[in-house]
């Protein structure tokens, strides 16, 4: 595995004071690094569909699905999908948020890989796992570009194969 930390820019006080934002756009702009990340996120796994969590998860999940010959399924913020959906809510630092997936996005027994850019508190990932399972599909793993280990998000995903390419 390659260390891509030099291609991830720290942006202090974004989007609000006290937050150190991890900007992955320099990594995405580097063809070799982006290709390696896409290859490694799904490496060694067998799956039928790849879930990408809005918004940066889309950037990573769609090429993983393409490279693997799998389908891509977007998990979006509430109100952004046009057909019947399942929804799951999760807590944020102040308040809560809701994500949705189309009710017909998976066939029962589909093997699903969840992909996102960052594993932080684990709330969003846990809600995505709940959505997939509600459809009758099986989550085989969740893969993230980076994990903010000090937030212990992995602890909110017990029994799940959690993979991260970088830990900060």
Go through each PLM region and give its residues.
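PRPP-associated nucleotide enzymes
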Residues: 1-168
């Amino acid at each position: 595995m390659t260390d891509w930390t030099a291609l991830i820019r720290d942006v202090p006080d974004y989007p609000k004071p006290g937050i150190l934002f991890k900007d992955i756009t320099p990594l995405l702009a580097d063809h070799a690094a982006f290709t390696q990340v896409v290859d490694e996120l799904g490496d060694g796994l067998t799956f039928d569909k790849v879930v990408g969590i809005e918004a940066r998860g889309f950037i990573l999940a769609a090429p993983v699905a393409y490279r693997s010959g799998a389908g891509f399924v977007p998990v979006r913020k509430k109100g952004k999908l046009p057909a019947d959906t399942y929804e799951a809510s999760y807590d944020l630092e102040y308040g809560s948020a809701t994500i949705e997936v189309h009710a017909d996005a998976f066939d029962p027994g589909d093997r699903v890989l969840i992909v996102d850019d960052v594993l932080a508190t684990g709330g969003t990932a846990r809600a995505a796992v709940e959505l997939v399972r509600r459809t009758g599909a099986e989550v085989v793993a969740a893969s993230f570009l980076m994990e903010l280990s000090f937030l212990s998000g992995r602890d909110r995903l017990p029994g799940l194969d959690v993979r991260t390419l970088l830990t900060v």
